[in-house]
């Protein structure tokens, strides 16, 4: 069986409109999970599928769902319009991403298949209006879907045909166990179901018993991460916390890390400390903060994917899961007080063309490491993962490596050959910058950013809908400036650059401009001093000869 030629999309009996959409997306052949799952799903079987992050799981369930809907509408008797597909995801960002992927695949059959996302940050009245039109597929988090079911704005008992639970191993970690059990009471007795997951844990086994009926289990024989020819993984030992900041400064300021980078930390406070530290050296970055409005978070991801930012600082949403297992993380709980329990970044969110993942803080579990590393080296693109580790953390990192590589296999985390003495000349700069980033400065920065983002998200929502181009002018990496910024730190004199790197490195340039040609003209037109043009006095007409 393994020697047989791989099954292509054109051999799966798909609707021509779906094949055209797949072609437009540039997919020449299915991934392993798509090749195995789509034919089984088209046969009407329940699926429990495990595949690593970035392997194409969304399309693996979206394509058979759309194919089933199109086939029944084309060949069966005329059916009453109703919701026939339900996709449950753990976070609002994943809901937006799943909706976008389904809509891309349904680009040539948009009149026949409509998709609605009920997890968006909209008022319930507008969502009720959307649900009254009975879209074919509804995407949402369990809490939002259950809310609509209880209000009778969404009815599934007589119409649902296909249920998808995406990132199944995260649902219980996000506190959705009770909601999910209540939601299942509103579904019909018979329906086809898919459970898609990156890991098989106890939560997935519980979900399997609740949702699936005689499922086919797909455990793909693939590593959790791409091979070393595509993904390079390194560790660098930093003797002190100060060394971590010093090394990060050198890597970014001297452009030793090229392309877009994701910086992972373990807490939001660490994220803002890191951002304010980088700000001292004119290195722009954004913090993907669950306290911010959903529109702001999605806008940050969108602009990062467009290449507007090179650095985004993020935390693991699932790190909080085991600590609050079985109950929703409340707004009054310790930690990120106002954070959205349905916001998350480490799993599933699709960041485009990430060149490097830097684990500034050591991930707490092997699973968290896999989810972080899965943000790069996607879709056959190369990537690098660099993990900063303190001496006291090395035994724990060794355990993570053993779980990833298996017993008796070669280590996958290679030592990063970096001579720290070469960048000692930068240490006094980093020490000054770290001293400026106090706890008070971090609190002020978080408060300032939340206030600004709330203003952008709520007060200007209608304006941006009417003027979408102006939304491009909204930046998320502008300086917060609660710390005392010294302008000279943004410049790197040649004598400070290590001798081995002189002439080879290119210090990071200034903030990238918005790719909007009218911006300069618009700013100039709004400034009367810059817009003023002095033409001088007109010369007096020459006197007529008498």
UniProtKB/Swiss-Prot annotation:
Q: Where is the composition biased (Basic residues)?
A: 325-334, 508-524, 532-546
* Gene encoding the protein: Ddx56
| Stretches assigned to the Helicase C-terminal domain | 230-424
> Can you say what this protein is called?
Probable ATP-dependent RNA helicase DDX56
Which CDD domains does the entry link to?
Answer: DEADc_DDX56, SF2_C_DEAD
| PTM annotation (Phosphothreonine): residues | 141
- Indicate where this protein resides in the cell: Nucleus, Nucleolus
Q: What class of enzyme is it?
A: hydrolase
Please describe what this protein does: Nucleolar RNA helicase that plays a role in various biological processes including innate immunity, ribosome biogenesis or nucleolus organization. Plays an essential role in maintaining nucleolar integrity in planarian stem cells. Maintains embryonic stem cells proliferation by conventional regulation of ribosome assembly and interaction with OCT4 and POU5F1 complex. Regulates antiviral innate immunity by inhibiting the virus-triggered signaling nuclear translocation of IRF3. Mechanistically, acts by disrupting the interaction between IRF3 and importin IPO5.
UniProt-annotated stretches for the region Disordered: 324-344, 508-546
Which residues bind ATP per the record?
Answer: 51-58
- Modified-residue entries (Phosphoserine), positions: 126
Motif Q motif positions after renumbering to this chain? 7-35
The record's annotation in SUPFAM superfamilies points to: P-loop containing nucleoside triphosphate hydrolases (SSF52540)
- Coarsely, its chief localization is nucleus
Quick one: a GO biological-process term for this protein? positive regulation of neuron projection development
């Amino acid at each position: 069986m393994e020697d047989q030629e791989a099954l292509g999309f054109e051999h799966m009996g798909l609707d021509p409109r779906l094949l055209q959409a797949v072609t437009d997306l540039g997919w020449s052949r299915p991934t392993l999970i798509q090749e195995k799952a789509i034919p089984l799903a088209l046969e009407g079987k329940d699926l429990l599928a495990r595949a690593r992050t970035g392997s194409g799981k969304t399309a693996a369930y979206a394509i058979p769902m759309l194919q089933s809907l199109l086939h029944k509408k084309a060949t069966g008797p005329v059916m009453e319009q109703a919701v026939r597909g339900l996709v449950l995801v753990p976070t609002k960002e994943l809901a937006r991403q799943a909706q976008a992927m389904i809509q891309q695949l349904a680009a040539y059959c948009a009149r026949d298949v409509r998709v609605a996302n009920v997890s968006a940050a909209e008022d319930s009245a507008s969502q009720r209006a959307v649900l009254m039109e009975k879209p074919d597929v509804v995407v949402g988090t369990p809490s939002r879907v259950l809310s609509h079911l209880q209000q009778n704005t969404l009815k599934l008992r007589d119409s649902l045909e296909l249920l998808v639970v995406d990132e199944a191993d995260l649902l219980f970690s996000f506190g959705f166990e009770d909601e999910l059990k209540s939601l299942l009471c509103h579904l019909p007795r018979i329906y086809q179901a898919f459970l898609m997951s990156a890991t098989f844990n106890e939560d997935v086994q519980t979900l399997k018993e609740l949702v699936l009926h005689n499922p086919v289990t797909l455990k793909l024989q693939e590593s959790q991460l791409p091979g070393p020819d595509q993904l390079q993984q390194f560790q660098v030992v930093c003797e002190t916390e100060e060394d971590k900041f010093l090394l990060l400064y050198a890597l970014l300021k001297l452009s030793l890390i090229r392309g877009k980078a994701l910086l992972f930390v373990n807490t939001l406070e660490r994220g803002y400390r890191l951002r304010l530290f980088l700000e001292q050296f004119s290195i722009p970055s954004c913090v993907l903060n669950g306290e911010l409005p959903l529109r702001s978070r999605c806008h940050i991801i969108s602009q990062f994917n467009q290449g507007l930012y090179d650095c985004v600082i993020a935390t693991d949403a699932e790190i909080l899961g085991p600590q609050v297992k079985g109950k929703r993380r409340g707004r009054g709980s310790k930690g990120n007080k106002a954070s959205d329990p349905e916001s998350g970044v480490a799993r599933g969110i699709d960041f485009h063309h990430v060149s490097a993942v830097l684990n500034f803080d050591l991930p707490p579990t092997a699973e968290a490491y896999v989810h972080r590393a899965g943000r790069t080296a996607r879709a056959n693109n190369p990537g690098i993962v660099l993990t900063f580790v303190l001496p006291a953390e090395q035994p724990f990192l060794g355990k993570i490596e053993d779980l990833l590589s298996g017993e008796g296999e070669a280590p996958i985390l290679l030592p990063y050959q970096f001579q720290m003495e070469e960048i000692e000349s930068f240490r006094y700069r980093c020490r000054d910058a770290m001293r400026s980033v106090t706890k008070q400065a971090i609190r002020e920065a978080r408060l300032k950013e939340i206030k600004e983002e709330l203003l952008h998200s709520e007060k200007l929502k209608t304006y941006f809908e009417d003027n979408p181009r102006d939304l491009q002018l909204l930046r998320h990496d502008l300086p917060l400036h609660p710390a005392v910024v010294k302008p000279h730190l943004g410049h790197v004199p040649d004598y400070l650059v290590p001798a081995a790197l002189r002439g080879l490195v290119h210090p990071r340039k200034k903030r990238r401009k918005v790719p909007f040609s009218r911006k300069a003209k618009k700013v100039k037109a709004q400034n009367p001093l810059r817009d003023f043009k002095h033409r001088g006095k007109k010369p007096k007409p020459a006197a007529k000869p008498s």
